Amino acid sequence: MIIETNHACDLVIFGAKGDLTKRKLLPALYKLEKSKKIHKYTRIIASGRADWSTEDYIEKIKTEVKNFLNEEINDLIWKNLSSRIFFCNIDVHEPLHFFRLKTILKQKKNIIVYYCAVPSNTLNSIFIGLGNAHLNSVPSRIVLEKPLGVCLKTSKKINDQISKYFLESQIFRIDHYLGKESILNLFALRFSNTCLFYNWNNKTIDHIQITVSEEVGIEDRWNYFNMMGQMKDMVQNHLLQILTILTMDQPKNISSESIQHEKVKILRSLNPINIHNINKKTVRGQYCSGVINEKKVPSYLEENGANKNSLTETFVAIKVDLNNKQWSGVPFYLRTGKRLAHKYSEIVVFFKKKPTNLFKNLNSELLQNKLIIRLEPNPNIIFDFSVKAPGLEQEYKIENSQLKSSQFSKKYSKNSIDAYERLLFEIMRGVQSLFVCRDEIEAAWKWIDPIIHAWKNSKNNAPQLYMSGTWGPKNSDLLLAHDGRVWYEFH
Protein backbone atom coordinates (compact mmCIF):
# COMPACT_ATOMS: atom_id res chain seq x y z
CA MET A 1 0.00 0.00 0.00
CA ILE A 2 1.32 3.46 -0.93
CA ILE A 3 1.03 6.07 1.81
CA GLU A 4 1.65 9.61 0.66
CA THR A 5 2.06 12.63 2.91
CA ASN A 6 -1.27 13.76 4.35
CA HIS A 7 -1.16 17.31 3.00
CA ALA A 8 0.48 19.12 0.13
CA CYS A 9 3.60 20.98 1.25
CA ASP A 10 5.84 23.71 -0.05
CA LEU A 11 9.32 22.48 0.89
CA VAL A 12 11.63 25.51 0.95
CA ILE A 13 15.33 24.58 1.01
CA PHE A 14 17.73 27.26 2.25
CA GLY A 15 21.18 26.24 1.04
CA ALA A 16 19.87 24.59 -2.12
CA LYS A 17 23.33 24.60 -3.73
CA GLY A 18 25.07 23.17 -0.66
CA ASP A 19 26.65 19.82 0.10
CA LEU A 20 23.81 18.53 2.29
CA THR A 21 21.21 19.26 -0.38
CA LYS A 22 23.21 17.54 -3.12
CA ARG A 23 24.34 14.52 -1.09
CA LYS A 24 21.26 13.83 1.01
CA LEU A 25 18.12 15.89 0.44
CA LEU A 26 17.71 15.65 -3.34
CA PRO A 27 18.52 11.91 -3.54
CA ALA A 28 16.04 11.31 -0.68
CA LEU A 29 13.36 13.34 -2.46
CA TYR A 30 14.01 11.36 -5.65
CA LYS A 31 13.43 8.10 -3.75
CA LEU A 32 10.25 9.45 -2.18
CA GLU A 33 9.07 10.44 -5.65
CA LYS A 34 9.94 6.97 -6.91
CA SER A 35 7.89 5.31 -4.16
CA LYS A 36 5.00 7.77 -4.72
CA LYS A 37 5.10 9.05 -1.15
CA ILE A 38 5.03 12.76 -1.99
CA HIS A 39 1.64 14.47 -2.23
CA LYS A 40 0.83 15.23 -5.86
CA TYR A 41 0.56 18.98 -5.17
CA THR A 42 3.74 19.31 -3.09
CA ARG A 43 6.30 21.81 -4.43
CA ILE A 44 10.06 22.16 -3.80
CA ILE A 45 11.34 25.74 -3.65
CA ALA A 46 15.12 25.88 -3.84
CA SER A 47 16.61 29.14 -2.63
CA GLY A 48 20.07 30.58 -3.11
CA ARG A 49 21.99 33.73 -3.97
CA ALA A 50 22.77 32.66 -7.53
CA ASP A 51 21.02 34.54 -10.31
CA TRP A 52 19.59 31.38 -11.84
CA SER A 53 16.33 30.45 -13.47
CA THR A 54 14.48 27.33 -12.38
CA GLU A 55 15.67 25.61 -15.57
CA ASP A 56 19.31 26.50 -14.75
CA TYR A 57 19.02 25.00 -11.28
CA ILE A 58 17.34 21.78 -12.44
CA GLU A 59 19.99 21.24 -15.11
CA LYS A 60 22.84 21.73 -12.62
CA ILE A 61 21.45 19.50 -9.88
CA LYS A 62 20.62 16.55 -12.12
CA THR A 63 24.32 15.72 -12.42
CA GLU A 64 24.73 16.02 -8.65
CA VAL A 65 21.81 13.70 -7.98
CA LYS A 66 23.31 11.15 -10.39
CA ASN A 67 26.58 11.23 -8.43
CA PHE A 68 25.00 10.56 -5.03
CA LEU A 69 21.95 8.45 -5.82
CA ASN A 70 23.70 5.07 -6.22
CA GLU A 71 21.26 4.08 -8.94
CA GLU A 72 20.42 5.09 -12.48
CA ILE A 73 18.05 8.04 -12.79
CA ASN A 74 14.72 7.08 -14.30
CA ASP A 75 13.68 9.79 -16.77
CA LEU A 76 9.99 9.67 -15.84
CA ILE A 77 10.67 9.86 -12.10
CA TRP A 78 13.09 12.74 -12.65
CA LYS A 79 10.55 14.52 -14.83
CA ASN A 80 7.92 14.23 -12.09
CA LEU A 81 10.34 15.40 -9.38
CA SER A 82 11.80 18.29 -11.37
CA SER A 83 8.30 19.52 -12.27
CA ARG A 84 7.84 20.30 -8.57
CA ILE A 85 11.00 22.44 -8.34
CA PHE A 86 11.16 26.25 -8.43
CA PHE A 87 14.29 28.32 -7.86
CA CYS A 88 14.02 31.53 -5.84
CA ASN A 89 16.92 34.00 -5.72
CA ILE A 90 17.34 34.96 -2.04
CA ASP A 91 20.18 36.40 -0.01
CA VAL A 92 19.10 35.42 3.52
CA HIS A 93 20.95 38.43 4.94
CA GLU A 94 18.60 40.72 2.99
CA PRO A 95 15.20 40.71 4.80
CA LEU A 96 13.37 42.21 1.81
CA HIS A 97 14.34 39.19 -0.32
CA PHE A 98 11.95 37.04 1.72
CA PHE A 99 9.04 38.85 0.11
CA ARG A 100 10.11 37.24 -3.19
CA LEU A 101 9.62 33.90 -1.48
CA LYS A 102 6.27 35.05 -0.11
CA THR A 103 5.06 35.77 -3.63
CA ILE A 104 5.72 32.15 -4.65
CA LEU A 105 4.22 30.68 -1.48
CA LYS A 106 1.02 32.72 -1.78
CA GLN A 107 0.24 30.97 -5.07
CA LYS A 108 -0.84 27.85 -3.14
CA LYS A 109 -2.39 27.08 0.23
CA ASN A 110 0.15 24.38 1.02
CA ILE A 111 1.71 23.73 4.43
CA ILE A 112 5.14 25.37 4.35
CA VAL A 113 8.28 23.50 5.48
CA TYR A 114 11.54 25.46 5.74
CA TYR A 115 14.64 23.25 5.61
CA CYS A 116 17.73 25.12 6.86
CA ALA A 117 20.61 23.31 5.14
CA VAL A 118 22.99 26.13 6.11
CA PRO A 119 25.71 26.81 8.72
CA SER A 120 24.54 27.74 12.23
CA ASN A 121 25.77 31.33 11.88
CA THR A 122 23.24 31.90 9.06
CA LEU A 123 20.18 30.67 10.94
CA ASN A 124 19.17 33.86 12.74
CA SER A 125 19.02 35.79 9.45
CA ILE A 126 16.54 33.19 8.19
CA PHE A 127 14.44 33.40 11.36
CA ILE A 128 14.31 37.21 11.14
CA GLY A 129 13.55 37.21 7.41
CA LEU A 130 10.69 34.74 7.76
CA GLY A 131 9.30 36.60 10.75
CA ASN A 132 9.41 40.02 9.07
CA ALA A 133 7.64 38.62 6.02
CA HIS A 134 5.03 36.92 8.26
CA LEU A 135 5.95 33.52 6.89
CA ASN A 136 6.25 31.87 10.30
CA SER A 137 2.63 31.25 11.28
CA VAL A 138 1.22 27.85 12.24
CA PRO A 139 1.07 25.30 10.60
CA SER A 140 4.42 26.13 8.94
CA ARG A 141 7.39 24.02 10.07
CA ILE A 142 11.12 24.67 10.23
CA VAL A 143 13.91 22.09 10.12
CA LEU A 144 17.32 22.55 11.77
CA GLU A 145 20.33 20.26 11.39
CA LYS A 146 22.31 19.11 14.41
CA PRO A 147 24.73 19.91 15.88
CA LEU A 148 23.12 23.22 16.84
CA GLY A 149 25.92 25.56 17.85
CA VAL A 150 29.35 24.57 19.15
CA CYS A 151 28.63 24.63 22.91
CA LEU A 152 25.79 25.06 25.40
CA LYS A 153 25.94 28.86 25.17
CA THR A 154 25.69 29.01 21.36
CA SER A 155 23.04 26.28 21.29
CA LYS A 156 20.89 28.22 23.77
CA LYS A 157 21.37 31.35 21.69
CA ILE A 158 20.06 29.64 18.54
CA ASN A 159 17.12 28.15 20.42
CA ASP A 160 16.30 31.54 21.96
CA GLN A 161 16.47 33.17 18.52
CA ILE A 162 14.16 30.69 16.83
CA SER A 163 11.68 30.72 19.73
CA LYS A 164 10.96 34.39 18.98
CA TYR A 165 9.37 33.36 15.68
CA PHE A 166 8.39 29.67 15.93
CA LEU A 167 6.67 27.48 18.52
CA GLU A 168 8.42 24.32 19.74
CA SER A 169 5.71 22.29 17.97
CA GLN A 170 6.84 23.84 14.65
CA ILE A 171 10.56 23.03 15.09
CA PHE A 172 12.10 19.80 13.75
CA ARG A 173 15.70 19.33 14.90
CA ILE A 174 17.32 16.60 12.84
CA ASP A 175 19.82 14.00 13.95
CA HIS A 176 19.88 11.74 10.89
CA TYR A 177 20.83 8.71 13.02
CA LEU A 178 17.25 8.74 14.29
CA GLY A 179 16.08 8.02 10.75
CA LYS A 180 18.20 4.89 10.38
CA GLU A 181 16.23 1.64 10.33
CA SER A 182 18.75 -0.09 12.57
CA ILE A 183 18.54 2.65 15.22
CA LEU A 184 14.74 2.59 15.19
CA ASN A 185 14.86 -1.16 15.65
CA LEU A 186 16.46 -0.63 19.06
CA PHE A 187 13.08 0.55 20.35
CA ALA A 188 11.38 -2.62 19.11
CA LEU A 189 14.20 -4.85 20.32
CA ARG A 190 14.09 -3.41 23.84
CA PHE A 191 10.39 -2.89 24.40
CA SER A 192 8.73 -5.79 22.55
CA ASN A 193 10.87 -8.71 23.74
CA THR A 194 10.19 -10.00 27.25
CA CYS A 195 13.53 -11.80 27.56
CA LEU A 196 15.39 -8.51 27.02
CA PHE A 197 12.97 -6.15 28.75
CA TYR A 198 13.31 -7.89 32.13
CA ASN A 199 17.07 -8.38 31.85
CA TRP A 200 18.03 -4.92 30.59
CA ASN A 201 19.58 -3.55 33.78
CA ASN A 202 22.52 -3.63 36.16
CA LYS A 203 21.46 -6.95 37.66
CA THR A 204 22.29 -8.91 34.51
CA ILE A 205 24.43 -6.61 32.31
CA ASP A 206 28.15 -6.22 33.01
CA HIS A 207 28.97 -3.44 30.53
CA ILE A 208 28.07 -2.13 27.07
CA GLN A 209 30.32 -1.03 24.20
CA ILE A 210 29.23 1.34 21.43
CA THR A 211 31.50 1.75 18.40
CA VAL A 212 30.98 4.04 15.40
CA SER A 213 34.04 3.57 13.20
CA GLU A 214 34.74 5.46 9.97
CA GLU A 215 37.29 4.74 7.25
CA VAL A 216 36.98 8.21 5.72
CA GLY A 217 38.89 11.29 6.82
CA ILE A 218 37.37 14.76 6.97
CA GLU A 219 36.48 14.81 3.24
CA ASP A 220 37.53 18.40 2.46
CA ARG A 221 35.57 19.78 5.42
CA TRP A 222 38.60 21.21 7.23
CA ASN A 223 37.07 24.48 8.43
CA TYR A 224 33.93 22.81 9.76
CA PHE A 225 35.58 19.77 11.30
CA ASN A 226 38.50 21.62 12.88
CA MET A 227 35.98 23.81 14.69
CA MET A 228 33.94 20.82 15.88
CA GLY A 229 36.20 17.80 16.32
CA GLN A 230 35.00 14.22 16.76
CA MET A 231 33.53 14.89 20.20
CA LYS A 232 31.10 17.56 19.00
CA ASP A 233 30.55 16.11 15.53
CA MET A 234 29.91 12.48 16.52
CA VAL A 235 29.64 11.94 20.29
CA GLN A 236 27.39 14.89 21.09
CA ASN A 237 25.55 14.43 17.84
CA HIS A 238 25.07 10.68 17.36
CA LEU A 239 26.58 8.42 20.02
CA LEU A 240 24.63 10.06 22.83
CA GLN A 241 21.46 9.37 20.83
CA ILE A 242 22.35 5.67 20.69
CA LEU A 243 23.17 5.70 24.41
CA THR A 244 19.86 7.29 25.39
CA ILE A 245 17.81 4.86 23.29
CA LEU A 246 19.71 1.93 24.84
CA THR A 247 19.19 3.08 28.42
CA MET A 248 15.93 5.06 28.58
CA ASP A 249 12.95 3.79 30.56
CA GLN A 250 9.97 2.58 28.58
CA PRO A 251 7.99 5.70 27.61
CA LYS A 252 4.28 5.97 28.38
CA ASN A 253 3.57 5.83 24.65
CA ILE A 254 5.40 6.40 21.35
CA SER A 255 4.58 10.11 21.14
CA SER A 256 7.46 12.54 20.65
CA GLU A 257 6.85 14.08 24.09
CA SER A 258 7.06 10.75 25.94
CA ILE A 259 10.16 9.54 24.10
CA GLN A 260 11.99 12.86 24.45
CA HIS A 261 11.12 13.04 28.16
CA GLU A 262 12.78 9.68 28.85
CA LYS A 263 15.86 10.53 26.79
CA VAL A 264 16.35 13.82 28.64
CA LYS A 265 16.21 11.93 31.97
CA ILE A 266 19.13 9.76 30.82
CA LEU A 267 21.23 12.71 29.66
CA ARG A 268 20.72 14.43 33.01
CA SER A 269 21.81 11.27 34.84
CA LEU A 270 25.25 11.07 33.16
CA ASN A 271 28.03 11.34 35.73
CA PRO A 272 30.17 14.43 35.04
CA ILE A 273 33.59 14.22 33.42
CA ASN A 274 35.86 17.17 34.16
CA ILE A 275 39.44 18.21 34.87
CA HIS A 276 39.57 15.87 37.90
CA ASN A 277 38.83 12.62 36.04
CA ILE A 278 39.42 13.50 32.38
CA ASN A 279 42.47 11.24 31.96
CA LYS A 280 40.75 8.24 33.57
CA LYS A 281 37.57 8.57 31.57
CA THR A 282 38.59 9.72 28.08
CA VAL A 283 41.11 9.18 25.30
CA ARG A 284 41.40 11.40 22.26
CA GLY A 285 43.51 10.93 19.17
CA GLN A 286 44.41 12.38 15.80
CA TYR A 287 45.16 10.32 12.70
CA CYS A 288 48.57 10.17 11.02
CA SER A 289 49.16 9.06 7.46
CA GLY A 290 48.70 5.39 6.69
CA VAL A 291 47.07 2.88 4.35
CA ILE A 292 43.34 2.15 4.03
CA ASN A 293 42.02 -0.30 1.44
CA GLU A 294 45.54 -0.53 -0.05
CA LYS A 295 45.60 3.22 -0.65
CA LYS A 296 47.92 5.71 1.04
CA VAL A 297 46.06 8.44 2.91
CA PRO A 298 47.40 11.69 4.42
CA SER A 299 47.50 12.67 8.08
CA TYR A 300 44.94 15.08 9.51
CA LEU A 301 47.55 17.84 9.47
CA GLU A 302 48.23 17.17 5.76
CA GLU A 303 44.60 17.53 4.66
CA ASN A 304 43.61 20.35 2.29
CA GLY A 305 43.59 23.69 4.11
CA ALA A 306 45.04 22.22 7.30
CA ASN A 307 46.46 24.22 10.18
CA LYS A 308 49.68 22.35 10.95
CA ASN A 309 49.38 23.12 14.67
CA SER A 310 45.82 21.89 15.13
CA LEU A 311 45.03 19.93 18.29
CA THR A 312 41.56 18.89 17.10
CA GLU A 313 40.70 15.27 17.85
CA THR A 314 39.62 12.82 15.15
CA PHE A 315 39.15 9.95 17.62
CA VAL A 316 37.39 9.72 20.98
CA ALA A 317 37.06 6.86 23.44
CA ILE A 318 35.14 7.56 26.61
CA LYS A 319 33.89 5.70 29.67
CA VAL A 320 30.39 6.83 30.60
CA ASP A 321 28.63 6.12 33.90
CA LEU A 322 24.96 6.71 34.67
CA ASN A 323 23.70 7.74 38.07
CA ASN A 324 20.32 6.03 38.25
CA LYS A 325 18.80 2.93 39.79
CA GLN A 326 18.69 0.87 36.61
CA TRP A 327 22.24 1.47 35.35
CA SER A 328 24.39 2.37 38.35
CA GLY A 329 27.58 0.28 38.24
CA VAL A 330 27.34 -0.53 34.50
CA PRO A 331 30.03 1.28 32.48
CA PHE A 332 29.37 2.27 28.88
CA TYR A 333 32.44 2.44 26.64
CA LEU A 334 31.99 4.66 23.59
CA ARG A 335 34.49 5.05 20.76
CA THR A 336 34.38 6.76 17.41
CA GLY A 337 37.04 7.89 14.99
CA LYS A 338 38.01 8.67 11.44
CA ARG A 339 40.51 6.77 9.28
CA LEU A 340 40.04 3.60 11.32
CA ALA A 341 40.52 0.03 10.12
CA HIS A 342 36.92 -0.62 9.03
CA LYS A 343 33.66 1.26 8.60
CA TYR A 344 31.04 -0.14 10.95
CA SER A 345 28.68 0.76 13.79
CA GLU A 346 27.94 -1.76 16.51
CA ILE A 347 26.59 -2.18 20.03
CA VAL A 348 27.86 -5.06 22.16
CA VAL A 349 26.03 -5.90 25.38
CA PHE A 350 28.15 -8.02 27.76
CA PHE A 351 26.07 -9.96 30.28
CA LYS A 352 27.42 -10.81 33.72
CA LYS A 353 29.13 -14.15 34.24
CA LYS A 354 27.50 -16.78 36.42
CA PRO A 355 28.81 -16.71 39.99
CA THR A 356 29.23 -20.52 40.01
CA ASN A 357 30.58 -22.90 37.37
CA LEU A 358 28.86 -26.28 37.25
CA PHE A 359 31.25 -27.50 34.53
CA LYS A 360 34.57 -26.42 36.05
CA ASN A 361 36.23 -29.84 35.68
CA LEU A 362 36.81 -29.22 31.95
CA ASN A 363 36.06 -25.51 31.77
CA SER A 364 38.05 -23.27 34.08
CA GLU A 365 35.91 -20.31 33.07
CA LEU A 366 32.56 -20.05 31.33
CA LEU A 367 32.31 -17.80 28.31
CA GLN A 368 30.51 -14.50 28.70
CA ASN A 369 27.14 -14.15 26.97
CA LYS A 370 27.00 -11.24 24.53
CA LEU A 371 24.32 -9.59 22.43
CA ILE A 372 25.89 -8.01 19.34
CA ILE A 373 23.72 -5.46 17.55
CA ARG A 374 25.29 -4.59 14.20
CA LEU A 375 23.88 -1.26 13.02
CA GLU A 376 25.86 -0.98 9.78
CA PRO A 377 26.89 -2.29 7.36
CA ASN A 378 24.57 -5.30 6.98
CA PRO A 379 22.44 -4.83 10.12
CA ASN A 380 22.22 -7.98 12.19
CA ILE A 381 21.58 -9.28 15.69
CA ILE A 382 23.87 -11.99 17.07
CA PHE A 383 23.65 -13.75 20.43
CA ASP A 384 26.81 -15.35 21.83
CA PHE A 385 26.02 -18.28 24.15
CA SER A 386 27.49 -21.55 25.44
CA VAL A 387 26.61 -25.11 24.41
CA LYS A 388 27.96 -28.61 25.02
CA ALA A 389 30.65 -29.66 22.58
CA PRO A 390 29.57 -32.81 20.69
CA GLY A 391 31.24 -36.08 21.65
CA LEU A 392 31.06 -39.26 23.78
CA GLU A 393 32.91 -37.84 26.77
CA GLN A 394 31.03 -38.13 30.03
CA GLU A 395 32.19 -34.73 31.22
CA TYR A 396 30.73 -31.60 29.69
CA LYS A 397 33.07 -29.63 27.48
CA ILE A 398 31.50 -26.21 26.94
CA GLU A 399 32.09 -24.24 23.76
CA ASN A 400 30.92 -20.95 22.32
CA SER A 401 28.13 -20.76 19.76
CA GLN A 402 26.30 -17.96 17.99
CA LEU A 403 22.68 -17.44 17.10
CA LYS A 404 22.43 -15.09 14.12
CA SER A 405 19.31 -13.39 12.86
CA SER A 406 19.93 -14.08 9.17
CA GLN A 407 16.29 -13.37 8.31
CA PHE A 408 16.59 -9.97 10.00
CA SER A 409 19.68 -9.15 7.94
CA LYS A 410 17.99 -10.16 4.66
CA LYS A 411 14.91 -8.06 5.39
CA TYR A 412 16.98 -5.00 6.19
CA SER A 413 19.12 -5.24 3.08
CA LYS A 414 16.01 -5.68 0.92
CA ASN A 415 13.74 -3.06 2.50
CA SER A 416 16.26 -0.54 3.79
CA ILE A 417 15.09 3.08 3.72
CA ASP A 418 17.56 5.95 3.69
CA ALA A 419 17.56 8.02 6.89
CA TYR A 420 16.83 11.30 5.11
CA GLU A 421 14.11 9.67 3.05
CA ARG A 422 12.33 8.65 6.25
CA LEU A 423 12.93 11.97 8.03
CA LEU A 424 11.72 14.11 5.12
CA PHE A 425 8.61 11.95 4.92
CA GLU A 426 7.95 12.44 8.64
CA ILE A 427 8.53 16.20 8.37
CA MET A 428 6.02 16.52 5.55
CA ARG A 429 3.55 14.48 7.62
CA GLY A 430 4.21 16.70 10.64
CA VAL A 431 5.28 13.85 12.95
CA GLN A 432 7.96 14.85 15.51
CA SER A 433 8.72 11.52 17.23
CA LEU A 434 12.03 11.03 15.34
CA PHE A 435 13.34 14.49 16.15
CA VAL A 436 15.18 16.10 19.05
CA CYS A 437 13.75 18.65 21.46
CA ARG A 438 15.49 21.70 22.93
CA ASP A 439 15.92 20.16 26.40
CA GLU A 440 17.62 17.11 24.88
CA ILE A 441 20.16 19.14 22.92
CA GLU A 442 20.98 21.41 25.84
CA ALA A 443 21.34 18.51 28.29
CA ALA A 444 23.84 16.90 25.89
CA TRP A 445 25.88 20.11 25.58
CA LYS A 446 25.81 20.60 29.35
CA TRP A 447 27.55 17.23 29.74
CA ILE A 448 29.93 17.65 26.78
CA ASP A 449 31.20 21.19 27.53
CA PRO A 450 33.19 20.31 30.71
CA ILE A 451 34.97 17.53 28.80
CA ILE A 452 36.06 19.93 26.05
CA HIS A 453 37.11 22.47 28.71
CA ALA A 454 39.13 19.83 30.59
CA TRP A 455 40.94 18.76 27.43
CA LYS A 456 41.94 22.32 26.66
CA ASN A 457 43.17 22.97 30.19
CA SER A 458 44.91 19.69 31.03
CA LYS A 459 48.71 19.53 31.14
CA ASN A 460 49.06 17.08 28.26
CA ASN A 461 46.38 18.49 25.99
CA ALA A 462 47.68 17.18 22.65
CA PRO A 463 45.69 14.29 21.13
CA GLN A 464 47.54 10.99 20.86
CA LEU A 465 48.58 10.13 17.33
CA TYR A 466 47.42 6.94 15.65
CA MET A 467 48.19 5.51 12.23
CA SER A 468 45.40 5.57 9.66
CA GLY A 469 44.02 2.08 9.11
CA THR A 470 44.36 1.03 12.77
CA TRP A 471 41.88 1.04 15.67
CA GLY A 472 43.04 4.32 17.16
CA PRO A 473 45.55 5.29 19.86
CA LYS A 474 46.91 2.61 22.21
CA ASN A 475 45.45 4.32 25.25
CA SER A 476 42.01 3.42 23.92
CA ASP A 477 42.81 -0.20 24.80
CA LEU A 478 44.17 0.85 28.19
CA LEU A 479 40.89 2.61 29.00
CA LEU A 480 39.23 -0.82 29.14
CA ALA A 481 42.30 -2.72 30.36
CA HIS A 482 42.22 -0.74 33.61
CA ASP A 483 38.83 -2.37 34.24
CA GLY A 484 39.98 -5.83 33.11
CA ARG A 485 38.13 -5.59 29.80
CA VAL A 486 38.95 -5.40 26.07
CA TRP A 487 37.21 -3.95 23.03
CA TYR A 488 35.10 -6.49 21.18
CA GLU A 489 36.91 -7.37 17.96
CA PHE A 490 35.34 -6.48 14.63
CA HIS A 491 34.26 -9.59 12.71
From Swiss-Prot:
One annotated GO molecular function: glucose-6-phosphate dehydrogenase activity
EC number annotated for this UniProt entry: 1.1.1.49
Any single GO CC term annotated in Swiss-Prot or TrEMBL for this entry: cytosol
GO biological process per UniProt: glucose metabolic process; pentose-phosphate shunt, oxidative branch
Keywords: Carbohydrate metabolism, Glucose metabolism, NADP, Oxidoreductase
Binding site for NADP(+): R49, D91, V92, K146
Any single Pfam family the record assigns to this protein: G6PD_N
Entry keyword Hydrolase: no
Catalytic function, reaction form: D-glucose 6-phosphate + NADP(+) = 6-phospho-D-glucono-1,5-lactone + NADPH + H(+)
SUPFAM superfamilies per UniProt: Glyceraldehyde-3-phosphate dehydrogenase-like, C-terminal domain, NAD(P)-binding Rossmann-fold domains
Annotated binding of substrate, by residue: H176, K180, E214, D233, K338, K343
Pathway: Carbohydrate degradation; pentose phosphate pathway; D-ribulose 5-phosphate from D-glucose 6-phosphate (oxidative stage): step 1/3
Active site residues of this protein: H238 (proton acceptor)
Disulphides: none
Entry-linked PANTHER family: GLUCOSE-6-PHOSPHATE 1-DEHYDROGENASE, GLUCOSE-6-PHOSPHATE 1-DEHYDROGENASE G6PD
Role description: Catalyzes the oxidation of glucose 6-phosphate to 6-phosphogluconolactone.
Record family assignment: Belongs to the glucose-6-phosphate dehydrogenase family.
Protein name: Glucose-6-phosphate 1-dehydrogenase
Organism this protein belongs to: Buchnera aphidicola subsp. Acyrthosiphon pisum (strain APS)
Lineage of origin: Bacteria, Pseudomonadati, Pseudomonadota, Gammaproteobacteria, Enterobacterales
